[in-house]
């Protein structure tokens, strides 16, 4: 029998799901309980933003992806935000910036503006004419061609990374860079960061960036 380890509350941003992962014997038991709870009002969650607060250190990356896939594919939620129940131990982006993360699994289209106080992770493209503002890092698993501002609250340790980094305007903290006029567009992942007073862009290396 499932323990009462999942609470769902409404807030102005959407729905907050509080999961006490330690109330369950393992991740699969928690997932079964979560699905059963959501299934009671499945259509209610369509288009909603879910903020999931739990002990992130107890959930590995594979299970996090599994949970997100179910929420997006079966319940058709709009956004999914993971938040550590112990913010001081949040390990979402260990080594560069630790904090809350907003996940978007869609294309950000022209005219759309995304703002968040923590990290922003986008699984999809960011089209020209769109704008991304993050207090932490901006990570795009796709082509980034819009305007992007990481470290918007002054965090000069923030980075911007994408599979194809082609923004019109790129800003980290209070430093701004514009796209070059030439047509040379690398076809490999790149990372932008501050070095001194300038923004530098370099190929992504897993040995150098722990993201």
Swiss-Prot record:
Domain of life where this protein originates: Bacteria
Spans through the membrane: none
GO process annotations (BP): cell morphogenesis; division septum assembly; regulation of cell septum assembly
Paired cysteines (S-S): none
Keyword terms: Cell cycle, Cell division, Septation
InterPro entries: CAP/MinC_C, MinC, MinC_C_sf, MinC_N_1, Septum_form_inhib_MinC_C
Stated family: Belongs to the MinC family.
Function description: Cell division inhibitor that blocks the formation of polar Z ring septums. Rapidly oscillates between the poles of the cell to destabilize FtsZ filaments that have formed before they mature into polar Z rings. Prevents FtsZ polymerization.
Record note on quaternary structure: Interacts with MinD and FtsZ.
Listed name of the protein: Probable septum site-determining protein MinC
Species of the source: Clostridium acetobutylicum (strain ATCC 824 / DSM 792 / JCM 1419 / IAM 19013 / LMG 5710 / NBRC 13948 / NRRL B-527 / VKM B-1787 / 2291 / W)
Gene that encodes the chain: minC
